[in-house]
Amino acid sequence: MTKVLVLYYSMYGHVETMAKAIAEGAGSVEGVEVTIKRVPELMTDEQAKKAGVKLDQSAPIATPSELADYDAIIFGTPTRFGNMCAQMRNFLDQTGGLWAGGKLINKVGSVFTSTGTQHGGQETTITSFHTNLFHYGMIVVGVPYSCQEMTNMNEITGGTPYGASTLAGGDGSRQPSENEIKIAKCQGVHVAKVAKKQSAS
């Protein structure tokens, strides 16, 4: 059984929604087992409530050491000035032991994101995140253009060859669109298929 982890941080629920879509896509591949987890919050409960953080997320909290248990990891993060959020950065900074032991070498890695605006750093967030995956020795996978929704020019939409993405809007009111959800599912399917082949080799 090929094991895929969808690991994310979501402040207002947009990345959480995308994570569920990616997990659905990955889980549709025969012989693949999918787990959804999230990284810990750095804010106190009081700070999080004041900031409007979505606290009722069902995904359990992950620990850095368990990353080695999976054949593929699909990371989800909102953007912070074109980079990953502090919560994800803090989590990855605790993986030095995994890196030193080569525990993530030849595992499949992929990234998805959410931004507030159309040009809010979707691609830079994903590609800068890839640097970490290269250091781990992971096989980096994005979204192929065989996913038809990638070429949709009829609406403002997220979705890049580097990874799925969504636009939250300046006030967070915009939810992932049908097109963005379909791209997220495509990413899940693609990563799962690559991981299945890799784990069988």
Swiss-Prot record:
Residues binding FMN, per UniProt: 10-15, 79-81, 114-120, 135
InterPro entries (UniProt xref): Flavodoxin/NO_synth, Flavoprotein-like_sf, Flavoprotein_WrbA-like, FMN_Rdtase-like_dom, NQO
GO cellular component: membrane
Cofactor binding note from Swiss-Prot or TrEMBL: Binds 1 FMN per monomer.
Keyword annotations of the record: Flavoprotein, FMN, NAD, NADP, Nucleotide-binding, Oxidoreductase
Catalytic activity: a quinone + NADH + H(+) = a quinol + NAD(+); a quinone + NADPH + H(+) = a quinol + NADP(+)
Keyword check for Oxidoreductase: yes
Domain Flavodoxin-like: 4-191
Pfam families the UniProt entry points to: FMN_red
Any coiled-coil regions, as ranges: none
Cofactor(s) recorded in Swiss-Prot or TrEMBL: FMN
Residues at which NAD(+) binds: Y12
Residues that, per the record, bind substrate: W99
Gene Ontology molecular function, alphabetical: flavin adenine dinucleotide binding; FMN binding; NAD binding; NADH:ubiquinone reductase (non-electrogenic) activity; NADP binding; NADPH dehydrogenase (quinone) activity
Entry's family note: Belongs to the WrbA family.
Name recorded for this polypeptide: NAD(P)H dehydrogenase (quinone)
Organism annotation: Hydrogenovibrio crunogenus (strain DSM 25203 / XCL-2) (Thiomicrospira crunogena)
